[in-house]
């Protein structure tokens, strides 16, 4: 593997068609440019527990919106330091590390969502993923410029076009996957038909003899649901058992 990623192995033969390089470079930048579609994640992240609307223990919008900022700052810092390493190691090695960081950042961030640990989301998507963004940004740009010394402006423009276009492609893709894998929580009925108990700022309803935390969706919240559903009472995806057992 080390030999395959070495700088020497990335030297193309003399008859290589240089117009293949922009295609790969733009594709890479389209992928990492999807970071600009981060805002699609904000609403679902504020209702991880409630799913249809925010529950008492869900993250606030102000708590999750800064993940994007951390990712962009990490991008800039990584790009600044990756340039020198790129000259020494070559684009293949830098590109593979970038892919591992970008993909690994998603995995760590997903673990943070699953365990409801906000710091893991910041570490994964913000820091690790951001480092992957930075290294993934400089590698195609540097390679393009080397292949097009006579058209440096055009080469840089193609790479930036891909990075900027990432949001255009990433936004509908992310919306599609969010809707595809969306699972509506259990619906208990209209708020007037369910016996609700409020404790410590949380709402509970008796389900099969057990108090379970619920959220109440009104006309305003219905408009913000990932997939439209009826107004009423929904069981939280995860609920605080300690409060329910009191």
Positions of the model-derived regions?
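Conserved small/polar residues in nucleotide/adenosyl-binding loops
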Residues: 239-244
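Hydrophobic core of transmembrane alpha-helices in multi-pass small-molecule transporters
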Residues: 118-134
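Conserved MFS/SLC helix-loop-helix module at the cytosolic interface between two early adjacent transmembrane helices
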Residues: 79-99
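Central cavity-lining transmembrane alpha-helices of secondary-active solute carriers
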Residues: 66-83
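C-terminal ends and interior cores of transmembrane alpha-helices
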Residues: 101-114
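Intracellular juxtamembrane helix-capping segments at the cytosolic ends
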Residues: 45, 135-148
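A gly/Pro-rich, aromatic-decorated transmembrane alpha-helix motif that marks the paired
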Residues: 161-187
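Cytosolic juxtamembrane N-terminal segment immediately preceding the first transmembrane helix
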Residues: 2-27
